[in-house]
Amino acid sequence: MRFAGIDVGAERHMVAVVGEQGEVLCRSSPFGEDASGYVHLFELLGPPEGCLLALEATGHY
């Protein structure tokens, strides 16, 4: 199981991923709101099976 936290921003977002034992799989990494940004995100997350996402959307968007 992998756990990913995404901080949603107006122009770019940040993602960090940890494993079940708390091991850091991806330190805070930015990704954009375009196709290449989401391709980058999917590369960082790996396969969708076994990945739990949490979003922090504190802005008005």
Task: Tell where the protein language model's regions lie, with residue ranges.
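Phosphate- and other anionic-substrate recognition elements at nucleic-acid/protein interfaces
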Residues: 1-61
